[in-house]
Design a protein with these regions (language model features):
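Glycine-rich phosphate-binding loop of actin/hexokinase-like ATP-binding domains
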Residues: 40-95
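Short beta-strand-loop/turn "lid" adjacent to the catalytic site in phosphate-handling enzymes
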Residues: 1-25, 37-38
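A short, structured active-site edge motif that brings together acidic residues
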Residues: 24-32
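ATP-binding/phosphotransfer module of carbohydrate and carboxylate kinases, centering on a glycine-rich
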Residues: 16, 34-44, 84-193
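Short strand-loop junctions, especially beta-strand C-caps/beta-turns
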Residues: 2, 68, 180-182
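Glycine/charged-rich beta-loop-alpha catalytic/anionic-binding loops adjacent to active sites
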Residues: 15-25, 59-69, 193
């Protein structure tokens, strides 16, 4: 999607190749989700899928976050990244034990944390977003580490929506908030609080 105004230039070859009319507009997919949930297009949308983004529209302006996991809520990638960081903090004795360690080791095929972290550091091992539903499962089962991570990502999304409402000048008015993406639709009660 279009995250930056300059991204529209990237689509010029597509317009030409598809012989689209010269007035064709490209928008960020978050704006499409906003209109899908709010036919007037007025309101906010919080996307929490593989990545994350918050967008909103008032009657006079449209705004969106960067969609870069910088100072804003991310999606499954951020959840998994925080899980990796938490497991490292357990390894260093900073955090108490959590089932997150065993989950990460099992999913990545490692018997011990030292070998796992060596593979992360030296072999470029990366965790994938496929781990996110399992982190949700651990949180739902009561694992404190997973609860903390899930709550952190969800809280950031809520903060982003509040900031978007303020920037749009909609504070103090009823605002429709659309939630889209796999994390929002997973029915994880802890994330949804």
């Amino acid at each position: 999607g279009i995250d930056w105004e300059s991204d529209t230039e990237l689509f010029a070859p597509t317009i030409s190749a598809l012989a689209l009319p010269t007035g064709t507009s490209f928008i960020n997919d978050s704006i499409a989700a906003l209109f899908a949930g709010s036919p007037s297009g007025i309101g906010c949308v919080s996307i929490a899928g593989t990545g994350g983004k918050t967008s909103g529209r008032s009657s006079t302006k449209t705004l969106q976050t960067m969609g870069m996991d910088l100072g804003e809520g991310g999606g499954a990638g951020q959840l998994v990244s925080l899980a990796l960081d938490y497991v490292a903090r357990i390894y260093h004795g900073i955090e108490p034990a959590s089932s997150l360690t065993q989950l990460v080791l099992t999913e990545c095929g490692y018997a011990d944390a030292t070998s796992f972290f060596q593979a992360v550091a030296r072999d470029g091992l990366r965790l994938t977003e496929d781990l996110a539903p399992k982190i949700f499962d651990l949180a739902t089962a009561g694992d404190a580490g997973a609860i903390g991570i899930v709550t952190a990502v969800a809280s950031q999304h809520a903060t982003d929506v509040i900031a978007m409402i303020d920037q749009l000048g909609l504070a103090g008015t009823p605002v429709q908030v659309i939630r889209a993406g796999g994390l929002h639709t997973a029915a994880c009660e802890i994330f949804d609080q």
